[in-house]
Amino acid sequence: KANFGHLGTHFDVMNKEFPLSYLERNGVIFDVRGIDEIEVIDLEKIRSGDFVIFYTGFLEKAGYGTKEYFQAHPQLSNNLIEKLLDKKVSIIGIDCAGIRRGKEHTPMDQYCADHNAFVVENLDNLESLLMQNEFTINTYPMKFSEMTGLPCRVVAKVD
């Protein structure tokens, strides 16, 4: 049951309750292709409550489910994650297997959830958002109890 929640695009909810107010959020995307340890972004673009997306291009490069995809994906620096939490973002989204690799993956997901920010992994089709200045993200999680991950559908609404 626990592994089912971590297939495809999903939230790492870490047994927390996903607030209904998070279903629709303002979105902001950062093009971080080619960066292995993502440290610097324009934090001024981020507002409290935003769904912050990192487009690494790694899903297309490595292919979902490959060994490389799960073990060698780009990651956010711990310092950047702290800054995102200080900005009180609602959701951190990325187009790879996580915001941290290896043994740091699960503890960082828990840390974010404990700070009311959820991580959405394995996002797809992000390149279509790169030219958008403003957009809204709607997130539709499947409802299961006692799971650390929830499969979800993430849809961007652009003007």
Predicted segments with their positions:
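Active-/binding-site microenvironments in catalytic and ligand-binding cores
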Residues: 1-159
